[in-house]
């Protein structure tokens, strides 16, 4: 059984027991979260597709950790002008373990 849900403006395809990195959520580590914006649920050969969300669909997850991703380097460069600007960014994330899927 798997489901597609949305969180943080992104869509994630998950199965039970899977660990997923989401955009940062303001939730304590060890807490349980319910995601109600389920777009699709599939079990074997049967599919439930929402318009836009599956009625009664829910993905339950437990927060495992919070952290920061790999550094992305941004370089702005003007040719022939001896001008260079460099910056970096590390995006915050929340790691969750999927504990239940229901439709």
Swiss-Prot record:
<dbReference type="InterPro" id="IPR001787">
    <property type="entry name" value="Ribosomal_bL21"/>
</dbReference>
<keyword id="KW-0687">Ribonucleoprotein</keyword>
<keyword id="KW-0699">rRNA-binding</keyword>
<dbReference type="GO" id="GO:1990904">
    <property type="term" value="C:ribonucleoprotein complex"/>
</dbReference>
<keyword id="KW-0689">Ribosomal protein</keyword>
<dbReference type="GO" id="GO:0005737">
    <property type="term" value="C:cytoplasm"/>
</dbReference>
<dbReference type="InterPro" id="IPR036164">
    <property type="entry name" value="bL21-like_sf"/>
</dbReference>
<dbReference type="InterPro" id="IPR018258">
    <property type="entry name" value="Ribosomal_bL21_CS"/>
</dbReference>
<dbReference type="GO" id="GO:0003735">
    <property type="term" value="F:structural constituent of ribosome"/>
</dbReference>
<keyword id="KW-0694">RNA-binding</keyword>
<dbReference type="GO" id="GO:0005840">
    <property type="term" value="C:ribosome"/>
</dbReference>
<protein>
    <recommendedName>
        <fullName>Large ribosomal subunit protein bL21</fullName>
    </recommendedName>
</protein>
<dbReference type="GO" id="GO:0019843">
    <property type="term" value="F:rRNA binding"/>
</dbReference>
<dbReference type="Pfam" id="PF00829">
    <property type="entry name" value="Ribosomal_L21p"/>
</dbReference>
<dbReference type="InterPro" id="IPR028909">
    <property type="entry name" value="bL21-like"/>
</dbReference>
<dbReference type="GO" id="GO:0006412">
    <property type="term" value="P:translation"/>
</dbReference>
<comment type="function">
    <text>This protein binds to 23S rRNA in the presence of protein L20.</text>
</comment>
<comment type="subunit">
    <text>Part of the 50S ribosomal subunit. Contacts protein L20.</text>
</comment>
<comment type="similarity">
    <text>Belongs to the bacterial ribosomal protein bL21 family.</text>
</comment>
């Amino acid at each position: 059984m798997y489901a597609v849900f949305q969180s943080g403006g992104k869509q994630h395809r998950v199965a039970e027991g899977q660990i997923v990195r989401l955009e940062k959520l303001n939730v304590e580590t060890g807490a349980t979260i319910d995601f109600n914006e389920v777009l699709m649920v599939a079990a074997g050969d049967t599919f439930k597709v929402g318009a836009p969300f599956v009625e009664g669909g829910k993905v339950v997850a437990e927060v495992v950790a919070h952290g920061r991703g790999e550094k992305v380097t941004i370089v702005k460069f003007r040719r022939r002008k001896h001008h260079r600007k460099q910056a970096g960014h590390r995006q915050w994330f929340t790691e969750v373990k999927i504990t239940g899927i229901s439709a």
